[in-house]
């Protein structure tokens, strides 16, 4: 029944993936070795979206773990849920990609990719009716970015009609791991524009801000950041895993969220925000959830939606929530902030409900928005890219792996096109003729 095959590539992807599996195993009542000891039939009803049932009441994630060096894999294997995964589904090289996109995409990664595809094929064959794939990776490194996008395009070739969702960690403006991040990210986005159906953009800096501002953590660890990401991933996939009044799957999400095929980069948010360990002790109401969910401080990508407009957005509410209250709240948000929504897509807020709340909460909400302000994120990466590419800095690492400068130029222009497409739809209004855009007056959103 509508299975999803999950891939995690590179260090970042594997750490986020591990946090995700930990979260949803808990929600489905599985312990660290995949044995079910839950309390509710709802946990079992659609378990098979993400898990295969093995003998002895054990459930095994339909996950493929990929990396070009064994380090992160060993850490996952040694972690609390390391025994959950099927041992054959760990596919790793020995050399590492060294933050080099070309190594991940053309040399080291390309050698490993067939081995990964064999595992993916085996997982897909074990499905009744495969719905699609989800990939967790970062765009700033070598393996997740280079090999991740290679896998996406290979899977696209083999399963052209299945959905492809990616949870992509975008390099942040201030926190940088490596100097070549802008190169890796631009080359990756160039691939994602063509090959992904929906990309949820997450960025470390926004996560740091949430941890420090909202959760009051002075010194957030990657564990805390991954906890936030896994909350969102669990929220986005909740409709697939539990029965609810208004269910949704990856394809419905895409149909409702993507007005133009290239514009499939979403911002995500979650409410109520809680730190690991400290569950909120106060009752939350639907208005509060809605308020927090639409709060720019709550977005997990560093772009402020007040600088753009929403093309579409969708909200997933979990828990014992009154349908009517949710509808009223969402309508309320739209009416009060109409300047932040494009007027040429009338009912552009989609809601879905699921009756099973996350662990430790009475109710929660997950937000996915397709906002034109995501262009800020691409602009920022593009500017950094241009600054280095103009001087051909660090290029020899890429050309040495057989890449051509032309590819960089193409990726750069594709990303610039993406930015201007977002800008064009931000400024479009109903009254204008077909192709006349008002260049003089960009829309300012008044608070």
Swiss-Prot record:
GTP binds at residues 11, 69, 138, 142-144, 204, 226. One of its GO terms (cellular component) is cytoplasm. Its main location: cytoplasm. Its cofactor is Mg(2+). It is found in: Cytoplasm, Cytoskeleton. It comes from the Eukaryota. GO terms for biological process: microtubule cytoskeleton organization; mitotic cell cycle. Keywords: Cytoplasm, Cytoskeleton, GTP-binding, Magnesium, Metal-binding, Microtubule, Nucleotide-binding. Residues 425-447 are annotated as: Disordered. The keyword Acyltransferase does not apply. Mg(2+) binds at residue 69. The keyword Oxidoreductase does not apply. One of its GO terms (molecular function) is GTPase activity. Residues 432-447 have a biased composition (Acidic residues). It holds the Pfam family Tubulin_C. Dimer of alpha and beta chains. A typical microtubule is a hollow water-filled tube with an outer diameter of 25 nm and an inner diameter of 15 nM. Alpha-beta heterodimers associate head-to-tail to form protofilaments running lengthwise along the microtubule wall with the beta-tubulin subunit facing the microtubule plus end conferring a structural polarity. Microtubules usually have 13 protofilaments but different protofilament numbers can be found in some organisms and specialized cells. Tubulin is the major constituent of microtubules, a cylinder consisting of laterally associated linear protofilaments composed of alpha- and beta-tubulin heterodimers. Microtubules grow by the addition of GTP-tubulin dimers to the microtubule end, where a stabilizing cap forms. Below the cap, tubulin dimers are in GDP-bound state, owing to GTPase activity of alpha-tubulin. Belongs to the tubulin family. PANTHER family: TUBULIN. This is Tubulin beta chain. The lineage of its organism: Eukaryota, Fungi, Dikarya, Ascomycota, Pezizomycotina. The gene is tubB.
